[in-house]
Amino acid sequence: MHLIFFFSYFLRRYLLLLCAILILRAPLAHSLIPPLTCVNTGTVESDVTGIRFDRCLDTDSLAKISLSTVMSKARVYTDVNVIRPKDYWDYESLNVQWGEQDDYEVVRKVGRGKYSEVFEGINMNNNEKCIIKILKPVKKKKIRREIKILQNLCGGPNIVKLLDVVRDQHSKTPSLIFEYVNSTDFKVLYPTLTDYDIRYYIYELLKALDFCHSQGIMHRDVKPHNVMIDHELRKLRLIDWGLAEFYHPGKEYNVRVASRYFKGPELLVDLQDYDYSLDMWSLGCMFAGMIFRKEPFFYGHDNQDQLVKIAKVLGTDELNAYLNKYQLELDTQLEALVGRHSRKPWSKFINADNRHLVSPEAIDYLDKLLRYDHQDRLTAKEAMAHPYFAQVRAAESSRMRTQ
């Protein structure tokens, strides 16, 4: 009994000492960080996050808590994946049901990306057109994630429909089979769009975004290339879910997502606990390009220059307020590149060529999307209720009444 007592006593003292050493050694991003306490039961509680741990943490874990002094969480759909069963979001456990590759035949190449080549194809069973996305060699985990997300979103408004998943018997190269959309290149289409067309298609895109967000999924690559529009049928589809990810509150994500011109400030300043609002920034960049006829709207030559281009429009005062709120710091080189800029009024972008597309409500809507602080941006549902879309909502209500 005495041996057990002394062993227990010294173990508790050792754990307390170890916690103290680890806290002192943990790299601090900022000077004002509340201390961690380790009680003598072996439980560690962070005053920063309120998280309790059943043991003393290693250096990396403590460093992460220290760096995340202001935890950011999504304003909406925060706990979708907390409430859902694990098999909804656990894509690593997905057992892929492979179809028959011989059921499909390639007709012509229609595009290529970093992770895939895209072809128009034919379903040999029913002679219907389809899109065949042949994936380049990537981690199986990434392929499973895209498939799982597409399966979860199947049937959602304006989400491209996954029809089948096949793979080559010899090379094992996987291909995703999608519904066919007769899309016009956005560089050709956008300059022809009327004011109402832009309102209509942005509203349709918001339907897709609100749906995927409501299902606990961030797209993370919203851009014109990934928004297919069949203008004749007035049909829109949000495609390419290869970078999409399940949202878990407090989780730190890779900031190397989205295409440069559409990257949110959170990615450019290395804020990792971002959320669905990233998609709303990308949408805002798209929208600005459409109404001002300036594509891309923020034209950075690299990631650092991208932040510079944003700062020259939104100003550096609000950028600094954003950094201070989340206790982030730019490295010295980037800080020097960004410099100091006053906010540029949206009216400075209006000219004779785009005046007919830029209304007061369009400017107000844009201003509520392109915010440094991701928590200040409109959510997709809030955006759909904006006065900018009043005409579109009225037309949709009228159409539904006559059906």
UniProtKB/Swiss-Prot annotation:
It is found in: Nucleus; Nucleus, Nucleolus. It comes from the Eukaryota. Residues 1-31 form the signal peptide. The active site is at 221 (proton acceptor). The keyword Nucleotide-binding applies. Disruption phenotype: No visible phenotype under normal growth conditions, but the triple mutant cka1, cka2 and cka3 show altered circadian rhythms and delayed flowering under long day conditions. Belongs to the protein kinase superfamily. Ser/Thr protein kinase family. CK2 subfamily. This is Casein kinase II subunit alpha-2. The lineage of its organism: Eukaryota, Viridiplantae, Streptophyta, Embryophyta, Tracheophyta.
